[in-house]
Amino acid sequence: MINSIKTLLLIATLAILSACGWHFQQSVTMPSEWRTLALESDDSYNDFTVIMRRKLQENQVNVVNLEQNIPILRINKQITSDQVASIFKHGREAEKLLMLEVEATFRLANGESYPINAKVNRTFFDNARAALAKSEEREVIWNDMREQVARQLIVKIIALQNQIKRK
C-alpha cells in the first residue's frame, strides 16, 4: 500500500513538472539597470561577437551603440587553440582537444570596470577519411562552444550584480 502511494506521488510530481513547463535553468534574467548596454569589440562582425549580441538580445537586453551613462561589455580577447589528445597506432592524430577562452570587461555606467572571462573545452574526433564532414563537424562544434561561452559570460554578468550589491 505504501509503495503504491509513493509510486503514485512520484508519477504525479513528474507529470506536474513536465506539464507546467518548468525546466532547470532554462534562462537567466539580466538586472533591469543593465537591460540596455553597449557591446564593444575589435571586430564587431566576427563569429563570437555576433553570437554574443544574439544571446544578449535573447535575454531581453537592448544592445545599442556606444553612449554615455550605459554599461559596456567589451570583448578584449578571444583565444582559440587545439591540441592533440590521442593518436592512432600508426602515429596519426585521432582526437583533438578544442579550447575557446574569451576575456572581457564589463564597465558600469559609473566607470567601474570588472574583468570577466569564460573558457570551454571540447574533444573532436579527427577522422581523416571524412575530410569534408570533419570540417563541417568542427565548425558546428566551434559555434556551439561560442554559444556556450556567451551564455557563461551572461551568467557571470548577472552574478556580478550580486557581488556589487555586497560592497
Curated annotation (Swiss-Prot):
It is a lipid-anchor. Its main location: membrane. This is LPS-assembly lipoprotein LptE. It comes from the Bacteria. Keywords: Cell outer membrane, Lipoprotein, Membrane, Palmitate, Signal. The gene is lptE. It is found in: Cell outer membrane. It comes from Haemophilus influenzae (strain ATCC 51907 / DSM 11121 / KW20 / Rd). Together with LptD, is involved in the assembly of lipopolysaccharide (LPS) at the surface of the outer membrane. Required for the proper assembly of LptD. Binds LPS and may serve as the LPS recognition site at the outer membrane. Component of the lipopolysaccharide transport and assembly complex. Interacts with LptD. GO terms for molecular function: lipopolysaccharide binding.
